[in-house]
Every structure is written in structure tokens, then in C-alpha cells.
Amino acid sequence: MKRNDPCWCGSGRKWKQCHYPQPPKMSPEALKQHYASQYNILLKTPEQKAKIYNACQITARILDELCKASQKGVTTNELDELSQELHKKYDAIAAPFHYGSPPFPKTICTSLNEVICHGIPNDIPLKDGDIMNIDVSCIVDGYYGDCSRMVMIGEVPEIKKKICQAALECLNDSIAILKPGIPLCEIGEAIEARADTYGFSVVDQFVGHGVGIEFHENPYVPHYRNRSMIPLAPGMIFTIEPMINVGKKEGVVDPKNQWEARTCDNQPSAQWEHTIAITETGYEILTLLND
């Protein structure tokens, strides 16, 4: 259905003037076909969602154990070695390992201080004052989970505490509004509105994404103000992973490893991520660890 088509409710008005952006009242199978043809978005079945939830819970558990192991003096390579052990323990595959071009060389991303995302583990020990995002993505029984969290090492400067808190609030604010019918752009609006209250910037080079059957699927989820009017619908599963900078929003990708993105002004950056499912009445955070 396009915006200028007659509204599905039978009012005779255009969809954009009537029930837009609410999706048509269809059977689950018809709605799934509509989203596949109109937006190239795969709405997950309850059976698929259950498998994705299992993958997300294992992903969240691995992330939790890695965060607990992140202490002063530990290297991120040691965290990657622990990650390999945990993936074996939970019968999971590390989705980032050898992903992309050039192939990503590790099983997790560890992004410290001014590194926005895709940090590659190395032999440098963690030290007092570091902040670090650990990003874990797992494949379990062929289904994907994806989440990340910030860790603070020892005594951390106030500005770093502030950027970690701001990024978490950006994520939480954007999740709180989720329900069927709202346009995708409201996610970015919520994130940028919260970042504005801190005077921080929102990275626009990297976005959230559909996930579950593949590592990266439609829809792509901008974390900044945008005009995407795709209405959320039950069965959509995607990540929200806002990257928030103290200074300028621009990032620079390392020309040597072609993965690590750093802030252009070397100011700190922070990111938190969850995988979320849209339900009939709202949302479910699939990577919220259920003990």
C-alpha cells in the first residue's frame, strides 16, 4: 500500500489522510506478504521469534559474562579468548568472526573511549578511566541475536560517565515509545531529542537493523531525525543501537584495518544496544537477560 492509495478502512480517503501510518487490518499471513512486497521486511512468525529469543538470551548471557570479566589490566584479546570459550559453552557461533570485507578478525567488538564502533580486540591492557563498549552477536541454531553494553574501568572522568548515561537514556527513550503503527522515524526523533538535552551528537554513519534470520536485514533503523514513515508492525524484529558522541557526530574509519570508527575530534563516544520485537500491543526486549 502506497501513501496515496485509498485507505484500507473503506473511508474513501487517501491512506496518508486517514489511518497512515497504521498498517492495514490484515490476517498475519497477508500482513507478512504486504511487508515483504512493500518494504522488503520479513515479519517473523511466533515460531521464528521463539528461536530468535533463544539466540538473544544466549547472546545477552555471553555479553554479561564478558562485562564482568572487564577489569583493569585485562586485555581485550583476553576478553576475545573468553568470548570464544563462552560461545563453545553455549553452542553458539560468533557472527562477527570473518564477517564482511575485509573479514573481521575477532569474535566480539571492543570499542574504547573515542572508538565509536567495530573496535578490534588487541593486547593493550584496560586501564583506569577507560570506557568500553562490548558488542556481541551470536548465531544459535541458525538464528541471530545482537546486543552491546558499556563498561567503565576504575575511576572514570565525569564526562565519560555522562556520555555512557546519555547513550543509555537514548536507547531507553527510543524503546519506550515502540508499538504497532508508529512510524520508524519516531525512534530517531526520541534518540536525538534526548541527546540534545545533553548537548551531545548522534552518529549518523551507522544504524540499527533488522535481525534474526540474517545478521543484517531490513528495516535499517536510523538513530537520528529522519523521514522514514514505515509503520511498525507485529513480527518486526530489529536492533536499536545509538552511538552518541561528546563532540562532533562524524566518525573516521581506520584506513588500515578498515573497521574501527573513531570520533573525528578524539572525544569520547558511547553506545548501548538491544534486539527488540514488536508485539500486538507494544514491544519485547529479546536481549534483556532473563535469569
Swiss-Prot record:
Function description: Removes the N-terminal methionine from nascent proteins. The N-terminal methionine is often cleaved when the second residue in the primary sequence is small and uncharged (Met-Ala-, Cys, Gly, Pro, Ser, Thr, or Val). Requires deformylation of the N(alpha)-formylated initiator methionine before it can be hydrolyzed.
Pfam families according to UniProt: Peptidase_M24, SEC-C
InterPro entries in alphabetical order: Creatinase/aminopeptidase-like (IPR036005), Pept_M24 (IPR000994), Pept_M24_MAP (IPR001714), Pept_M24A_MAP1 (IPR002467), SEC_C_motif (IPR004027)
Cofactor dependency: Co(2+); Zn(2+); Mn(2+); Fe(2+)
Disulfide bonds: none
Family classification: Belongs to the peptidase M24A family. Methionine aminopeptidase type 1 subfamily.
Keywords, in A-Z order: Aminopeptidase, Hydrolase, Metal-binding, Protease
GO biological process assignments: proteolysis
GO CC terms in record: cytosol
Co-factor remark: Binds 2 divalent metal cations per subunit. Has a high-affinity and a low affinity metal-binding site. The true nature of the physiological cofactor is under debate. The enzyme is active with cobalt, zinc, manganese or divalent iron ions. Most likely, methionine aminopeptidases function as mononuclear Fe(2+)-metalloproteases under physiological conditions, and the catalytically relevant metal-binding site has been assigned to the histidine-containing high-affinity site.
EC number: 3.4.11.18
Species per Swiss-Prot/TrEMBL record: Chlamydia pneumoniae (Chlamydophila pneumoniae)
Assembly mode: Monomer.
Stated name of the protein: Methionine aminopeptidase
Residues that hold a divalent metal cation 1 according to the record: 135, 146, 273
Residues where a divalent metal cation 2 binds: 146, 209, 241, 273
